[in-house]
UniProtKB/Swiss-Prot annotation:
One of its GO terms (biological process) is respiratory chain complex IV assembly. Component of the cytochrome c oxidase, the last enzyme in the mitochondrial electron transport chain which drives oxidative phosphorylation. The respiratory chain contains 3 multisubunit complexes succinate dehydrogenase (complex II, CII), ubiquinol-cytochrome c oxidoreductase (cytochrome b-c1 complex, complex III, CIII) and cytochrome c oxidase (complex IV, CIV), that cooperate to transfer electrons derived from NADH and succinate to molecular oxygen, creating an electrochemical gradient over the inner membrane that drives transmembrane transport and the ATP synthase. Belongs to the cytochrome c oxidase subunit 3 family. The chain crosses the membrane at residues 16-34, 41-66, 73-105, 129-152, 156-183, 191-223, 233-256. This is Cytochrome c oxidase subunit 3.
Amino acid sequence: MTHQTHAYHMVNPSPWPLTGALSALLMTSGLTMWFHFNSMTLLMIGLTTNMLTMYQWWRDVIRESTFQGHHTPAVQKGLRYGMILFIISEVLFFTGFFWAFYHSSLAPTPELGGCWPPTGIHPLNPLEVPLLNTSVLLASGVSITWAHHSLMEGDRKHMLQALFITITLGVYFTLLQASEYYEAPFTISDGVYGSTFFVATGFHGLHVIIGSTFLIVCFFRQLKFHFTSNHHFGFEAAAWYWHFVDVVWLFLYVSIYWWGS
């Protein structure tokens, strides 16, 4: 690395892609074992291996960027393109769920009673918990933007305050969603309405948990002075992801909760 004549980071050999692939194999096999034989042993081994791989791989990335200085502007540009493509892939992922919902709701079959919501389904009131959830996520979008601007201006105190507020709102959203699921008058097995509702909102909830975890890591990194006003792609990626989660929820709220009810 001493005599490098280019701006790109030549990554050292790493075991983490191999252990990541192994953990994916164990998790998918473990799911099958759980579904068919009611044994969670293989699934737990897979999840543990996956968590350890993620922790150690991202630990290496933080060391290479923050402490060894390998993330030059050219490398950061590549990471930005990578994050943008990842978010686009997530948009297409959710497009499939919206497609399933609109396919079923715009032309309900005779089996559904020829109406939407299907006969016997009592949808949730969009002006109760779903509206509160919308307010919570919109507020978190404001606070993450406040945190980003504070970071760019070198205002460490306000950045930490705003980031903490965002994380708190993310956790609050998750708790509200869990209580809504617990009290819902229908289940995932209640036909196409139940399956599209719980799969779409459930995967969004999973993304909120992932985004909250991402932001918690950024919070602790900021406490350790890892970010500067012009070198903070880890936080920027988390902010982009959080805005994506916000926008997806708005589409979910308008489509499934409001129009779909």
